[in-house]
Amino acid sequence: MPDVVVVGAGVIGAACAEALSAAGVDVTVIDRGTPAGGTTASGEGNVLVSDKEPGPELTLAIASRREFGVVLARLPEQVADVEWEAKGGLVVAKGEPEPLEKFAKTQREAGVDARVISPADAFELEPLLTRAVTTAVYYPDDAQVQPVLLATALLAAVRARGGEVRAGVTAIAVRQKDGRVTGVETEAGVIECDAVVNACGPWAGSFGTAAGGPIEILPRRGMILVTAPLPECVRHKVYDADYVGAVGSGDADLQTSTVVESTRAGTVLIGSSRERIGFDDAVKVHVLRELARKAVGIFPFLADVPVMRTYGGFRPYAPDHLPVIGPDPRVPGLWHATGHEGAGIGLAPATGRLLTELFIGVPPHLDPSPFRVDRPAVVGVS
């Protein structure tokens, strides 16, 4: 019998399972689909400290950036190549430079390496950048990873330590006795355990309800364009200053902001969009057109580059823009790890570490209270 069943084999569930198993906890991971086949597969692989205002999420991001080295070193050798690239990020503005410079200053005060550079320096970093740029901030700690490779490698580490990963197993409810979790009910039967981790991403709200611990997690749709393979053309993660505002917005309407980056395969990823439209997965041509238009505004050469494909997915959105990490006080033995929206790849290592620290009862490496389950925005109490 496992100690813990993690429901959800995306990057957050995989990171929690890996950290728990590294601490000696017996873990089983289940997913109704294939591992890393949901939200994780629709991500860009962003590991960013540059897009977050000072506060709890930035603190988690800084900790997670440090934790990546620890986690990657624990991976089995045969799956250790997750296309990790510490390429750095470049945020550019084409208007008044003061807002971007002010934002960078507040981040530096919070411990981020944020370097305001001149347009000439920006063009040296990215020669194909539009000459309309008026100011830029360079973030050497921004990085990129292949999200599916990362999640599957984390799960491979769980298996290597004796844990189990089961695909195609749908969790239905949590079984309790004397007020504590005793197992998780699935379509394939009951898996007995002492604790259950709800890592269901944008579906965490519905599973939380089924488990007796409802939480307010909503899906937020995002779309990405993928170009045909190209010679080296975009060297860093490059995005416009509007990206920060879009990340932190709670507006349900469509928002787009430019983020452009290359992959090891030579393709260029173009994002990003955010829209709260439930689980509507229809391809919206007007969204793709807007992404392309804005990307050309940053990198004019993209106007002549063919788009090979597009993909999108649903990201787990919490109304106060903070992840939910920790025990559910209403159901002893039920834990949650969700609500990271589009930042789950970058926040996964610190999330796994924090949940594990709380689970085994050691002092956490950062203050867990901002991410607690029983906060008003998540459980709807005042």
Regions found by a protein language model. Give the residues of each.
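Short beta-strand to alpha-helix junction loop
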Residues: T59, V91-P99, V137-A156, A282-V287, ...
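N-terminal Rossmann-like FAD-binding beta1-loop-alpha1 element of flavoenzymes
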Residues: D3-T28
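Dinucleotide-binding Rossmann-like beta1-alpha1 core, especially the glycine-rich loop
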Residues: G45-L125, A295-V296
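C-terminal catalytic lobe of FAD-dependent flavoproteins
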Residues: P147, D280-A282, H286-S382
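Helical element adjacent to the flavin cofactor pocket in flavoenzyme catalytic cores
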Residues: V137-D194
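Active-site substrate-recognition segment that forms the wall
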Residues: E18-A19, G45-N46, A80-E85, P202-P329
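Short hydrophobic core segments
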Residues: V5-V7, I191-W203, F207, G352
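Glycine-rich FAD pyrophosphate-binding loop
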Residues: A22-A41
